[in-house]
Amino acid sequence: MTSVASEPLSSQKRWIVIYPAYIDKKKTAKQGRKISQILAVENPTSVEIHDVLAAVGFNPLLERTKCYPRDGERDFEVQGRVRVQLKNDDGTAKHEQKTRDEIFKMVAEMIPKLKTRQPGYTAPSVASSSAAAAGKKNKKKK
């Protein structure tokens, strides 16, 4: 069995892991928050973390079935984690964010700017289903 340390840095096993609890404002440091509460964001999801990292230029890997070990509630919305490559095989930084903490802070800063976090946003599936239901109500019987 080979150790993870012997794998190249580009191997997905060597990528850093980001759980939503790491940047959740409602979590304490004991519950797993890794950045200061001032910089943290309320109720981040693994999908939001993935979207932010993809928009910035990272190549993130979303693992929806994984759970944070310290999280007792195991809610499906916050379930999941994201893996990101931090360094190239030669040890140089892959992006301008060189450390885990820099990536955590950047993600927490960008999540409130997502469309889904803007006031007045409705999910497309909710809007289309309500329009379809409204169309059915207006039908007349023959």
Curated annotation (Swiss-Prot):
Organism the protein comes from: Caenorhabditis elegans
Role according to the record: Component of the signal recognition particle (SRP) complex, a ribonucleoprotein complex that mediates the cotranslational targeting of secretory and membrane proteins to the endoplasmic reticulum (ER). Binds directly to 7SL RNA. Mediates binding of SRP54 to the SRP complex.
Coiled coil regions, renumbered to chain: none
The entry's keywords: Cytoplasm, Nucleus, Ribonucleoprotein, RNA-binding, Signal recognition particle
Compartments reported by the entry: Cytoplasm; Nucleus, Nucleolus
Cellular component terms per the entry's GO annotation: nucleolus; signal recognition particle, endoplasmic reticulum targeting
Principal localisation: cytoplasm
Keyword Signal recorded: no
Disordered, as annotated region: 115-142
Claim: Zinc-finger is one of the keywords in the record: no
Similarity remark: Belongs to the SRP19 family.
A Pfam family that the UniProt record links to this protein: SRP19
Source organism, top-level taxon: Eukaryota
GO biological process: SRP-dependent cotranslational protein targeting to membrane, signal sequence recognition
Compositional bias segments (type: Low complexity): 123-135
Name of the featured protein: Probable signal recognition particle 19 kDa protein
Oligomer and partners: Component of a signal recognition particle complex that consists of a 7SL RNA molecule of 300 nucleotides and six protein subunits: srpa-72, srpa-68, SRP54, F37F2.2/SRP19, F25G6.8/SRP14 and ZK512.4/SRP9.
